Amino acid sequence: MLTLGAPVALVVIFGYIFGSAISVPGGGDYRAYLVSGLFATIAANIVPSMVAAARDRTRGVVDRFRSLPITRSAVPLGQAAATALYGLASFLLMALCGLAVGWRAGRGAADAAAALGLLAAFQFAATWVGIYLGLLIGKEETAAQASILVFPVTMLSNVFVPTAGMPAWLRTIADWNPVSALAAAARQLFGNPGSPANGAWPLLHPVAASLAWTALLLIIFVPLATRRYARA
């Protein structure tokens, strides 16, 4: 997840400095396109949960919790829930930044609530990925350094630019990136520009694709993180 100040910087840098050079599919305001993509970036960032899990293991917090009479899934579940609450604050700040630069949710309150719910669900699922990797890495410093590897996942997507202008091989990767599906779903539900007229299945059916990715991440990483916590 981005830090609380990062959305402001990204909106300024990409929205005002680079925005005039980027065209949106079907026309429309680039800043509206960008803000919806940044919502997806916030939801997909696993770095805070990864670093927190590694820090807890390094400092012996995991050992202390395991000595308590609680289920082994309670601690990672609590961390995932806490990260989700922090994410709500990030979404709120992102919305305020967006409103300040002209972004609007054009399809009404119900669809906007659906968009936020989808973003929160994906973030909850992504948090489990971070928890598992943090426990696997085991050292806070190493986890912080490994966070640089997460950056390309965001860049190889449609968050900042449409994938149509990418080379064919790179576009395939970007189109099937879960972050691209989530960003496209946010744009669709918020009523923002940028929905492609043709392309890969996840971008033509972004809400369904985002729900599928969310379910897949939970199915894979909840048991992995729980077992790793029990053995940490």
Task: Show which residues each predicted segment covers.
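Hydrophobic alpha-helical transmembrane segments
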Residues: 1-30, 232
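Hydrophobic alpha-helical transmembrane segments of multi-pass membrane transport proteins
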Residues: 6-15, 30-101, 154
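Small-residue-enriched core segments of transmembrane alpha-helices in multipass membrane transport
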Residues: 8, 34-43, 113-128, 148-155
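Alpha-helical transmembrane segments of multi-pass membrane transporters/translocases
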Residues: 11, 15-16, 187-232
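Short helix-capping/hinge motifs at transmembrane helix termini and TM-loop junctions
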Residues: 14-23, 101-106, 135-139, 161-165, ...
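Transmembrane helix segments
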Residues: 18, 134-180
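Alpha-helical transmembrane segments and their short interhelical loops
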Residues: 72-147, 205-223
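Terminal transmembrane helical anchor/hairpin motif
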Residues: 161-205
